[in-house]
Each structure stands twice: as C-alpha cells, then as structure tokens.
Amino acid sequence: MKLSAVAGRYARAFLNIAIENEKEDEYLRFLDFVCNVYESNKDLFDNPVVKPEKKVTLIKSVLEEFGEEMDEFQERFLMLLFERKRQKLLRNIHELFEYEKILSEQKVPADLRIAHVPKEEELTLLRKFIRKYALKDPVFKTTVDESLIAGAVVEFEGFRLDTTVQGRLKRLSQETLKRGEMS
C-alpha cells in the first residue's frame, strides 16, 4: 500500500489530539471502524451528491448501533475529511496513525511473517533479539504465511532477519551461483 504525505499529516494531527485527550487506543479503534464502514459503502461515501454532514451523521448512527459514541474531535476530523474529499485516504491514515502511535510509545514496529501461529516462547526470543538491536520493545504485526515452510521473517527499522527454510535455500543457491561464477 502506498502511503501519502497528506495522509501522514492527517494521521499525526489526529494522533496529537488523541494523545492530548489520552484516548490513543480509542481513536485507533474509531479509525478502524470508520475504515470498515467506508470500505463497505464506498459508492455512498464517494458520492458527491451526498453532503459531508449526511455522511458523518450516517457513520455516527452506525457507531451508535454498536454502542459506541463519536466525540467532537472525531466528528470534526471526519467532517474535514469529507469536506476536502480525502475519505479515500482513510486506510492510509489508519495505517500511519497506528505506526505513529507505536513510535510515540517509544516502541518499534516489527513485521513478522511466520509459517504458523507463533508460540509465546518464539515471540519472547524475537522480542529479546529486537530489543538487543533496536533498544526498544517491539510491537509485532503478525502475518501467517504457510509458503515459508518453516521459520520466520522479521523486519524492523530497516533490518531483516530471515530464518525460513525458503530464505536459507535462496541464500544457498546465491552462494552456489557466486562460487560457480568465480571458478
């Protein structure tokens, strides 16, 4: 997914409000909910005939059906997005908000691709490894990828650790090719 600079500005501004009100987790859940509502009704929310006020009111009513409320900052944030026709950036804003939230907590985001659902002892080892190099606690975004056969791939702060069978085979074939070229 391509992340835009505009989405970054919206995400940081919304996170600053969330931090000020000590509602970071609540605002993250709100963004996730709004993204899902928007993505399931894109035709309606992208329709220029429907006024921004109506779109925000609709999201507010859906939130209320799920027992949630929208505060004034969330409402103004959505109104701004719809007035400026930036609703297509909602998923990017959500992703960047989540990323910036992790950084604001003095943690490091880490992508974990693993062949199976990770066990707690595996996560503990990976946490220790990342703490050693990043000097921060990791927050994992885990993806199960059965094509990896076994092992895991962890990426954080520009580093990549690949312990998969697939990765080992790839490195082995590259080494073999290098040796073949040198002979």
Swiss-Prot record:
Q: Which UniProt keywords apply?
A: ATP synthesis, Cell inner membrane, Cell membrane, CF(1), Hydrogen ion transport, Ion transport, Membrane, Transport
Q: What InterPro entries does this protein's entry cite?
A: ATP_synth_OSCP/delta_N_sf (IPR026015), ATPase_OSCP/dsu (IPR000711)
Q: Which GO terms describe its cellular component?
A: plasma membrane; proton-transporting ATP synthase complex
Question: Keyword Cell membrane on this protein?
Answer: yes
- List the subcellular locations: Cell inner membrane
Q: Does the keyword RNA-binding apply?
A: no
How does the entry describe its membrane topology?
Answer: Peripheral membrane protein
- Where is the major localization of this protein? membrane
Give one GO term, molecular function aspect.
proton-transporting ATP synthase activity, rotational mechanism
Q: Which domain of life is it from?
A: Bacteria
**Assembly and interaction partners:** F-type ATPases have 2 components, F(1) - the catalytic core - and F(0) - the membrane proton channel. F(1) has five subunits: alpha(3), beta(3), gamma(1), delta(1), epsilon(1). F(0) has three main subunits: a(1), b(2) and c(10-14). The alpha and beta chains form an alternating ring which encloses part of the gamma chain. F(1) is attached to F(0) by a central stalk formed by the gamma and epsilon chains, while a peripheral stalk is formed by the delta and b chains.
Query: Sorted alphabetically, which NCBIfam families does this protein's record hold?
Result: ATP_synt_delta, PRK13441.1
What family is reported?
Answer: Belongs to the ATPase delta chain family.
- Function of the molecule: F(1)F(0) ATP synthase produces ATP from ADP in the presence of a proton or sodium gradient. F-type ATPases consist of two structural domains, F(1) containing the extramembraneous catalytic core and F(0) containing the membrane proton channel, linked together by a central stalk and a peripheral stalk. During catalysis, ATP synthesis in the catalytic domain of F(1) is coupled via a rotary mechanism of the central stalk subunits to proton translocation. This protein is part of the stalk that links CF(0) to CF(1). It either transmits conformational changes from CF(0) to CF(1) or is implicated in proton conduction.
For this entry, the protein name equals: ATP synthase subunit delta
Question: Which species does the entry assign this protein to?
Answer: Thermotoga neapolitana (strain ATCC 49049 / DSM 4359 / NBRC 107923 / NS-E)
